[in-house]
Amino acid sequence: MDSNTVSSFQVDCFLWHVRKRFADQELGDAPFLDRLRRDQKSLRGRGSTLGLDIETATRAGKQIVERILEEESDEALKMTIASVPASRYLTDMTLEEMSRDWFMLMPKQKVAGSLCIRMDQAIMDKNIILKANFSVIFDRLETLILLRAFTEEGAIVGEISPLPSLPGHIDEDVKNAIGVLIGGLEWNDNTVRVSETLQRFAWRSSNEDGRPPLPPKQKRKMARTIESEV
């Protein structure tokens, strides 16, 4: 196993521990708590894949961070912070909408790279909107936290989420996953539109009503792809 992979996991575990202590003091805002919960799942998946104990890794990560801080001057820290571009966290969904459990009568699932696409194909003739929470840098989607499809009544009928064991995706991955989700939902005569935030940074639809321009052939192809890979 590559030593950089192990040490990266150890540092991530310790930094998550620090953030958790911060949140336990009720100091974190909604986006902070959002990322904390998602990163916990990611660390568990990585730990399982690597065969490493999280508690042991956290202790090792603490030693690595302490060694770095001992060598770090205040001036170097200021220069590092100034040179790193700042990302923005955008939210379509509330914390309740993100954390709510949901169930599917006819579950369909597809894994596309490091993203998992899930939908309930029992849903028919509904008006559906896609909402997402994600970070943006240089006016492009940086990291998808979670995307969900909601009916007008507020029911969750679809979802795109990063796989904890396979971190890392780009905006094109998210765009392709959105296309697959829309194709599957529109196969059952649902009307799907995308939130303004998603249109701007992830989908860039030219339609004024936020409906992505998917031709019928592409819809059918996407729906068949989901069915064939479940």
From Swiss-Prot:
Transmembrane segments: none annotated. It comes from the Viruses. The keyword Oxidoreductase does not apply. Residues 205-230 are annotated as: Disordered. Coiled coil: none annotated. Keywords: Eukaryotic host gene expression shutoff by virus, Host cytoplasm, Host gene expression shutoff by virus, Host mRNA suppression by virus, Host nucleus, Host-virus interaction, Inhibition of host innate immune response by virus, Inhibition of host interferon signaling pathway by virus, Inhibition of host PKR by virus, Inhibition of host pre-mRNA processing by virus, Inhibition of host RIG-I by virus, Inhibition of host RLR pathway by virus, Interferon antiviral system evasion, RNA-binding, Ubl conjugation, Viral immunoevasion. Homodimer. Interacts with host TRIM25 (via coiled coil); this interaction specifically inhibits TRIM25 multimerization and TRIM25-mediated RIGI CARD ubiquitination. Interacts with human EIF2AK2/PKR, CPSF4, IVNS1ABP and PABPN1. The dsRNA-binding region is required for suppression of RNA silencing. This is Non-structural protein 1. It comes from Influenza A virus (strain A/Turkey/Ontario/6118/1968 H8N4). The lineage of its organism: Viruses, Riboviria, Orthornavirae, Negarnaviricota, Polyploviricotina. The gene is NS.
